[in-house]
């Protein structure tokens, strides 16, 4: 396959970001490179999942009783019921992140979809991983991307390396809460950074805009707040 830049690539706002050429490929080729995408019943779009066992901060938090990660939905319910099918696919995706054509594969998968969610299971693995996701976002300007994460340190490293205006305009990075009813404490270096917002988890009173899904049969329906810079609060589930 010959290399060619996407004609409508949305560049990050800084000049020190490495430009990754996008190699055109079919959906079948994309699946071979980076695995398949996932579909969840409540979401209005495709999503991408990794194994929770690979979570860095999440794995540590899961050992703390009462933390959100200790109650992780991705280790229960639908995911647990079908783990014999889901887990191998998730680990295959994890292995594929280092593939030189991973960015191209994800760009092909996403295409011109209006919305996309990163990590309905799992989380960021490294600064290089986040840089690749940013490259995917830059190469899919028609798509609004939502990236929830507890890897605050990786986000801080990204901003320190590339600058406060380096998050692609079509990407929302949502710092996720560690505990129910305790709002996210945004690191000083990430305060006021365009594209960075938070999500909290509540048992009673919402801390921000309450997610509407519980009142809508667990579905987003026409709500797209998670793809905005608004603070969102999810009911503990």
Protein language model annotation of sequence segments:
Residues 3, 10-237:
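Class I S-adenosyl-L-methionine
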